[in-house]
Amino acid sequence: MPSVNITKNNKTTLYISGLDQQVNEAVLHAAFIPFGEIIAVQMATDTEIDSNNIHRGFGFVEYELAEDCQAAMDNMHLSELYGKVIKVQLAKTINVTTTSNRAVWTDESWLQKYGNVEDVEEKQEDEKENNQETTSEKKEVSSYIPSSEKRGKKSRVYLDIQIGNTLAGRIEIELRGDVVPKTAENFRALCTGEAGFGYKKSSFHRIIPQFMCQGGDFTKGNGTGGKSIYGGKFEDENFVLKHTGPGTLSMANAGSNTNGSQFFICTEKTTWLDGKHVVFGQVVSGMNVVREMERCGSASGKPSKRVVIVDCGEL
């Protein structure tokens, strides 16, 4: 999509940092459009490098409405895009007129205060947190032994969904153990509960219409918890399967090789997630239930009703 000048209204403009070089304005637009009408998207190009394909790792998204901007910030801050955790905050304004054609990142004083320096500090803090998290995870070892009979084969599981106080119905999913055996086995065993823990009675904590329904955090219920049958987080198995359309089942993560138990069911085609999230299944029955779940979602991701997996297992 073409660049459009960002205004100085910091109530509707987001500053997004930590962007991978694969991210362009079209990708940024696609990632943030679920939250509301976007007026403009700009990437900060590196003026020291003679190439239109190189950016400085951050960009701006301007929304028409302040509430949409706030919803995007609340939902996308510390989320993952192209394998990197991004940071989203309200853009800091500089003293220029709204009719100025000068991009905000061309002001070096702005960059020193709000741009790259901040990113370095945040990166150092992130590395510190990640090191602490990795050390903690190494202590968590599972005694569960995954079924060797199920690995390498397709299987089917079900999720019985309750929305509010009403039983909405059953979702049946085919797991692609023939393509991603480790990932599929993790989900299957969490559905049956044979490892001593699993998805039963857990909720879908994040639902965004025209995007996806995310669940699987059975330890904290807010998107910060969950664990795999392997004792902690496990690696990205492969990216053979793609996010081709509604009903795609994929692993939620916080960056490369951080798979646990959280997953999401796509309600639309989400190709920008290809190569970054491991697809391991497909809804084969009950897509109407997924659509009913989707209607409980919001731009911020917070469901209007509690959506719970009241029962689950293998077919």
Swiss-Prot record:
SUPFAM superfamilies per the UniProt record, alphabetical: Cyclophilin-like (SSF50891), RNA-binding domain, RBD (SSF54928)
Ranges for region Disordered: 119-148
Domain RRM span(s) in chain numbering: 12-93
Compositionally skewed regions (Basic and acidic residues) per UniProt: 125-141
Gene Ontology process terms (BP): protein folding
Matches recorded under CDD domains: cyclophilin_ABH_like, RRM_PPIE
PROSITE patterns: CSA_PPIASE_1, CSA_PPIASE_2, RRM
Pfam family, one: Pro_isomerase
InterPro entries recorded: Cyclophilin-like_dom_sf, Cyclophilin-type_PPIase_CS, Cyclophilin-type_PPIase_dom, Nucleotide-bd_a/b_plait_sf, PPIE, PPIE_RRM, RBD_domain_sf, RRM_dom
Catalytic activity: [protein]-peptidylproline (omega=180) = [protein]-peptidylproline (omega=0)
Domain annotation PPIase cyclophilin-type: ranges: 158-314
Matching Gene3D superfamilies: 3.30.70.330, Cyclophilin-like
GO cellular component: mitochondrion
Enzyme class, UniProt record, top EC level: isomerase
Enzyme Commission number: 5.2.1.8
Record's keyword terms, sorted: Coiled coil, Isomerase, RNA-binding, Rotamase
Coiled-coil stretches noted in the UniProt entry, renumbered to this chain: 114-142
Gene Ontology molecular functions: cyclosporin A binding; peptidyl-prolyl cis-trans isomerase activity; RNA binding
PANTHER family named in the record: PEPTIDYL-PROLYL CIS-TRANS ISOMERASE, PEPTIDYL-PROLYL CIS-TRANS ISOMERASE D-RELATED
Similarity annotation: Belongs to the cyclophilin-type PPIase family. PPIase E subfamily.
Function per UniProt: PPIases accelerate the folding of proteins. It catalyzes the cis-trans isomerization of proline imidic peptide bonds in oligopeptides. Combines RNA-binding and PPIase activities.
Name of the molecule in the record: Peptidyl-prolyl cis-trans isomerase E
Lineage: Eukaryota, Fungi, Fungi incertae sedis, Mucoromycota, Mucoromycotina
Gene for this chain: cyp10
